[in-house]
């Protein structure tokens, strides 16, 4: 059915995909479902799901190695790295070196055809360079983000460990499915836990 979720609604909720922040921007108003009594804005998971479907189809059109996914945020680093391994995309977890996309003298210089950012605010350097070279930007966006220069927004909790793992897992699966590399979504056998940043307890 066309209105079915990519994963059960309970799985989205358990991962906290819908949990926003206590700030909202005008840009994000259309993605907000409600505000809780404690002032926390809650995202509309249906819209998250819809955007993941669109993003999967869009990204599947690119050569795998021409996709760049980045995450300065700690909890996005393992998901981005695993996403790269699974889809063939280039991944930069951690610090994004200025000039990576714009300065051929930089050691790991790379000109992608599309950029995926985990958080427009944290990944602002990568976004700035993507705008400079004129490539589309797919962004995971929370309630306090702005959509300036974002071509395709995926509304989600972009700070939570489990939320980021689930979003990148779904996105990887959707890309493989839309490329025809798997015949059905059930053929994607990699557990979501492999996308999840582990907490090191001292």
Curated annotation (Swiss-Prot):
<dbReference type="GO" id="GO:0006412">
    <property type="term" value="P:translation"/>
</dbReference>
<dbReference type="InterPro" id="IPR005707">
    <property type="entry name" value="Ribosomal_uS2_euk/arc"/>
</dbReference>
<protein>
    <recommendedName>
        <fullName>Small ribosomal subunit protein uS2</fullName>
    </recommendedName>
</protein>
<dbReference type="InterPro" id="IPR001865">
    <property type="entry name" value="Ribosomal_uS2"/>
</dbReference>
<comment type="subunit">
    <text>Part of the 30S ribosomal subunit.</text>
</comment>
<comment type="similarity">
    <text>Belongs to the universal ribosomal protein uS2 family.</text>
</comment>
<dbReference type="InterPro" id="IPR018130">
    <property type="entry name" value="Ribosomal_uS2_CS"/>
</dbReference>
<dbReference type="Pfam" id="PF00318">
    <property type="entry name" value="Ribosomal_S2"/>
</dbReference>
<keyword id="KW-0689">Ribosomal protein</keyword>
<dbReference type="GO" id="GO:0015935">
    <property type="term" value="C:small ribosomal subunit"/>
</dbReference>
<dbReference type="InterPro" id="IPR023591">
    <property type="entry name" value="Ribosomal_uS2_flav_dom_sf"/>
</dbReference>
<dbReference type="GO" id="GO:0003735">
    <property type="term" value="F:structural constituent of ribosome"/>
</dbReference>
<dbReference type="InterPro" id="IPR023454">
    <property type="entry name" value="Ribosomal_uS2_arc"/>
</dbReference>
<keyword id="KW-0687">Ribonucleoprotein</keyword>
């Amino acid at each position: 059915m066309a209105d079915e979720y990519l994963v059960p609604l309970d799985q989205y909720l358990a991962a906290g995909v819908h949990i926003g922040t206590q700030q909202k921007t005008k840009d994000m108003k259309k993605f907000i479902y409600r505000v809780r009594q404690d002032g926390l804005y809650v995202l509309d998971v249906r819209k998250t799901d819809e955007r993941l479907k669109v993003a999967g189809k869009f990204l599947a059109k690119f050569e795998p190695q021409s996709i760049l996914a980045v995450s300065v945020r700690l909890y996005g680093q393992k998901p981005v790295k695993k996403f790269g391994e699974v889809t063939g995309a280039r991944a930069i977890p951690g610090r994004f070196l200025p000039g990576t996309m714009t300065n051929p003298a930089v050691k790991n210089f790379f000109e992608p055809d599309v950029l995926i950012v985990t958080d427009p605010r944290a990944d602002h350097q990568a976004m700035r360079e993507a705008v400079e070279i004129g490539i589309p930007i797919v962004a995971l966006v929370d309630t306090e983000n702005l959509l300036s220069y974002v071509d395709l927004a995926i509304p989600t909790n972009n700070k939570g460990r489990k939320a980021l793992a689930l979003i990148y897992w779904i996105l990887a699966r959707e890309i493989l499915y839309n490329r025809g590399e798997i015949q059905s979504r059930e053929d994607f056998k990699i557990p979501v836990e492999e996308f999840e940043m582990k907490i090191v307890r001292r």
